[in-house]
Structures are given as structure tokens and as C-alpha cells.
């Protein structure tokens, strides 16, 4: 199958989203689609699969002009779209999710459960996934759920599979497994459209890459013929000479010290310090316990023993309100469920942790909060029509800036950032890195959890590595390497691991 999208345009009201986009993909290749959030990637794919209709342009499938009335018709013709946010019914079984609205029936019109179980197991086995198909799909890891989505695509005889940020929540092992499946299916003639912000993945898995910017298809390359620097330039419209900004850390006294923090079965004897003006990276494999440690420090989860000191004084943090009172902020890895109230305005989200400071005589000073929010939005260059728009209407990068604004506005002296640039485009990443440097210049202590090793190495002054709930070593950011981090992250011993 060969799909050619030619001169595709699309407007929503007065907003022109696509401006004459060209894109081609064929069976047996992986074609990456890159661009900043808002570049038009999702809109283009939604036009291909029939969710939207283009205003002009044409789609050719094997040379024939084609349009689909919706995703179901596109799927029937061999085009499958696996979205970043998988729409599984978590309490239903794997097999029931796979055959939802496509149930097999006996000649008597009854549900053929045996045939559905056998087919589900068969298509999963083609991917090397041996699963109990009668268990609830919610029991599976995100990586396993993704395998189920790919198996569903194969059931519909997909010739082209669209994958949107497929590795965003996967472990390194699951990413390796996913890439193995993609390569095997490619050899069997399946084509992939691979949407991702992760540069290193593009060079590992893609044969071609198309870059979009501001609703235009800017360039197409064979991956072997292009550099990361060129792709970044094409995406943002300018050169970013140094992807990670230079840091000239000026560390002050210890802002926070953690001693012997323990929660049985989750983490054990965790001890570390972070100084004013420092970025302390936390690295480790997914499931190592990094997020759980920070949730305990912030008062979301309980711990059995250990001590937290701020500015040298022991503090009791029983819940997040205690943490906020002690000037600790926490940007969670799941900003949509925990960091923001998506249906609420930017104003209400940003002012939430600081609202007590704006109450006079029992009433909120609306004028003061409005000025406060506008100042923070300007300072963090939040791209939005104004403070009254909903948080859910913003791109991922701007949502992340709103969460940062919330904690900066609350006067956080210790700021925990859990996967601060996950799902964020390359231009917004650089803006977030610059903000982190600006905060440390103001003596804020930052703890950054990241699964992106280049990010950890590029931004951290020191790097704490966690393995099975324990800190196995702390490395100097200047001398650490991916190899030294992975040695500690897999339980090995690194001779240059320094003091806690």
C-alpha cells in the first residue's frame, strides 16, 4: 500500500491549521513525522483516517483518489491509528477489548467466545506476547497494552499503522520489545507512521522523517542522511546551537536533606541532599522507585521511617498542604490527572496553591490574582489567548509551563520536577530548561526525575541513581556518562559514584 497526501489544507473557523501539506508513506517502511506541538501532525493523521475532512488537497491510496468517512472505514481499508491515550476499558478483559464492536458469532448468532480467545491469543503470539487474554486489560503494563493495540491492528489486516508517541510511558525493556515488533512487521510489509518527539528513537527505528512546522511540511529526509541538529532547526525554524543551555551553578547551603526514608517494599534507606541553586537529577529504570520517593517527600504517600530536613531543621510533612506550607512544589509526571484541573481556567490553576495569600477580610482579591497570573504567564511565555481559557485547551508544553507557573508563584524553594519535558516539543523543552536555570539562579533547589538520559546528563549538577528502591550512587554531572548511569541503574557498581 502506498499513501500520498498532496497539498492538504484544513481550517477550523478562521484558524488555518494545515497549509498545503505533502506526506507519503509505503508498506514496509517506518516514516517518522516530527514537529512541535501545534505543528499539525495530529490534524493531518485525523484527515488521513477520516475523522476530519480536508478543505482542499487529495489523498491517493495506491494511486486512486480516496477519502474515508471515519476511522472505522479507514481501518477496514488497512489503516490503523494507535493513539497516545489508549481508549481501553480497563475493567474488561483483553479479548473483550480486542473484539469490542467486532464480536465473532456462531452460525446461531451466539457470541463465539472460544474463537475470539483463540484469535486474540494468535495475534498476540505473532508479536511474541504470551498473555492470559481473559484477564482485565487494566492488569497489564502500558507496554503490554500497546502490544494489544498492535494485535488489534493486525486483526483488521492493517497495512499502515499510525503510532502517536508510542514510547511516552514505556520502560527501556518495553521500548526494545516494541521496536523489535515494529522491525518484524516491517519485514512482513507493514508500514508505520511514527509520531515522536524523541530524537534518538527516530534515528533508531525510522527509515524516513518528515518535519512539520506551523501547518507546513518543511522537509523530508532519509534518516541516514540527516543530523539531529538539522531536524531541530527544521522544527523550530532556527538553530539551537546548544540543546541544553550552559549552567554556571552557584550552590548555596543545603536546602533539603532526606535521611533514611523507608517504605517497606517500595524504597529503603533513601538519603540525599540538594543544595540551593542545584539541579539534582534522579535517574533509574521505570519502576525503580524514583516517583514513589518524591510522592512520599511531598506528602502524597506515607512512609514508615526516615527524616526530612529543610534548611537544617526537621519537618513533618503529612500531606501536600504541609509540603506547600514548607515551600516545596511538585510537578507530577501525569500533569493531566494530577498537575492540572483541565476544565478550569489557567487563572484558577495557577493561583490555586497561593490563594490564601490573596484573601482579605474573607474575600479573594480578584484584581491582585489577575495581575499575579498575567505576570507569571508573561514570565514563562505561556502561549494562550488569556488567563480565562481552560488548561485543557493548551499544548503539552504550555500545560507544563502552567504547572511550573503554579509552583513558582507559590514561592517554592524546593521544586520537584517529575519528567518535566515528557510529551513536550523540542522548542518548549529548551524554554523549560532555560526556566530551570533561571530558578536555580534565584537559589531554588530543583530535583529532576527524568527517563531521558541525555536530558539528565545535560541538565544535572549531580545525578542520583535509583535501583530497586535504593540510591546506588550519586554521580558528578560533569563526568557522568550514559554507561555509568546504566551501570548503577541495573544494580552494578560504579567506581566514580560519589558521596550522598
From Swiss-Prot:
Similarity comment: Belongs to the ABC transporter superfamily. Ribose importer (TC 3.A.1.2.1) family.
Main location: membrane
Assembly mode: The complex is composed of an ATP-binding protein (RbsA), two transmembrane proteins (RbsC) and a solute-binding protein (RbsB).
Residues where ATP binds: 35-42
Catalytic activity as recorded in UniProt: D-ribose(out) + ATP + H2O = D-ribose(in) + ADP + phosphate + H(+)
Protein name: Ribose import ATP-binding protein RbsA
Function description: Part of the ABC transporter complex RbsABC involved in ribose import. Responsible for energy coupling to the transport system.
Matches recorded under InterPro entries: AAA+_ATPase, ABC_carbohydrate_import_ATPase, ABC_transporter-like_ATP-bd, ABC_transporter-like_CS, P-loop_NTPase
Enzyme Commission number(s): 7.5.2.7
Subcellular location: Cell membrane
One Gene Ontology cellular component: plasma membrane
Residue span(s) of domain ABC transporter: 3-239, 246-493
Domain of life: Bacteria
Membrane association type: Peripheral membrane protein
Amino acid at each position: 500500500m502506498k499513501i500520498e497526501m498532496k497539498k492538504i489544507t484544513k481550517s477550523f473557523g478562521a484558524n488555518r491549521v494545515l497549509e498545503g501539506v505533502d506526506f507519503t508513506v509505503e508498506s514496509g517502511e517506518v516514516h517518522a513525522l516530527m514537529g512541535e506541538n501545534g505543528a499539525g501532525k495530529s490534524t493531518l493523521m485525523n484527515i488521513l483516517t477520516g475523522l476530519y475532512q480536508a478543505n482542499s488537497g487529495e489523498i491517493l491510496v495506491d494511486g486512486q483518489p480516496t477519502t474515508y468517512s471515519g476511522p472505522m472505514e479507514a481501518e477496514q481499508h488497512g489503516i490503523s491509528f494507535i493513539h497516545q491515550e489508549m481508549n481501553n476499558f480497563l475493567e474488561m478483559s483483553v479479548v473483550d477489548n480486542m473484539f469490542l464492536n467486532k464480536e465473532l458469532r456462531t452460525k446461531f448468532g451466539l457470541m463465539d467466545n472460544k474463537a475470539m480467545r483463540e484469535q486474540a491469543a494468535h495475534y498476540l503470539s505473532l508479536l511474541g506476547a504470551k498473555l492470559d487474554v481473559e484477564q482485565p486489560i487494566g492488569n497489564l503494563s502500558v507496554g503490554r497494552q500497546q502490544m494489544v493495540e498492535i494485535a488489534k491492528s493486525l486483526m483488521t489486516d492493517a497495512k499502515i499503522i499510525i503510532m502517536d508517541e508510542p514510547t511516552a510511558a514505556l520502560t527501556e525493556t518495553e521500548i526494545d520489545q516494541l521496536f523489535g515488533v515494529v522491525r518484524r512487521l516491517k519485514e512482513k510489509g507493514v508500514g508505520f507512521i511514527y509520531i515522536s518527539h524523541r530524537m534518538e528513537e527516530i534515528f533508531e527505528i525510522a527509515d524516513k522523517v518528515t518535519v512539520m512546522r506551523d501547518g507546513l511540511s518543511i522537509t523530508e529526509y532519509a534518516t541516514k542522511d540527516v543530523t539531529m541538529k538539522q531536524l531541530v532547526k527544521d522544527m523550530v525554524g532556527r538553530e539551537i546551537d546548544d540543546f541544553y543551555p550552559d549552567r554556571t551553578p552557584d550552590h548555596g547551603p543545603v536546602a533539603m536533606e532526606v535521611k533514611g526514608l523507608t517504605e517497606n517494599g517500595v524504597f529503603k534507606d533513601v538519603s540525599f541532599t540538594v543544595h540551593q541553586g542545584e539541579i539534582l537529577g534522579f535517574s533509574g529504570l521505570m519502576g525503580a522507585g524514583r516517583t514513589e520517593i518524591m510522592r512520599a517527600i511531598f506528602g502524597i504517600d506515607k512512609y514508615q521511617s526516615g527524616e526530612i530536613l529543610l534548611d537544617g531543621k526537621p519537618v513533618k510533612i503529612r500531606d501536600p498542604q504541609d509540603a506547600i506550607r514548607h515551600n516545596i512544589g511538585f510537578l507530577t509526571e501525569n500533569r493531566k490527572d494530577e498537575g492540572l484541573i483541565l476544565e478550569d481556567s489557567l487563572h484558577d490553576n495557577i493561583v490555586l496553591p497561593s490563594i490564601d495569600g490573596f484573601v482579605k477580610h474573607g474575600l479573594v482579591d480578584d484584581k491582585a490574582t489577575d495581575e499575579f497570573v498575567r505576570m507569571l504567564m508573561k514570565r514563562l511565555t505561556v502561549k494562550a489567548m488569556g488567563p480565562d481559557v481552560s488548561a485543557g485547551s493548551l499544548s503539552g508544553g504550555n500545560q507544563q509551563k502552567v504547572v511550573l507557573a503554579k509552583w513558582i508563584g507559590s514561592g517554592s524553594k524546593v521544586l520537584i520536577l517529575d519528567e518535566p519535558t515528557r510529551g513536550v516539543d523540542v522548542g518548549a523543552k529548551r524554554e523549560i530548561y532555560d526556566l530551570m536555570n533561571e530558578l536555580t539562579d534565584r537559589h531554588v533547589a530543583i530535583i529532576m526525575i527524568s527517563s531521558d538520559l541525555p536530558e539528565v546528563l545535560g541538565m544535572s549538577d549531580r545525578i542520583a541513581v535509583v535501583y530497586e528502591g535504593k540510591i546506588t550512587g550519586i554521580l558528578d554531572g560533569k563526568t557522568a556518562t550514559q554507561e555509568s548511569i546504566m551501570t548503577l541503574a541495573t544494580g552494578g557498581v560504579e567506581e566514580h559514584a560519589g558521596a550522598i
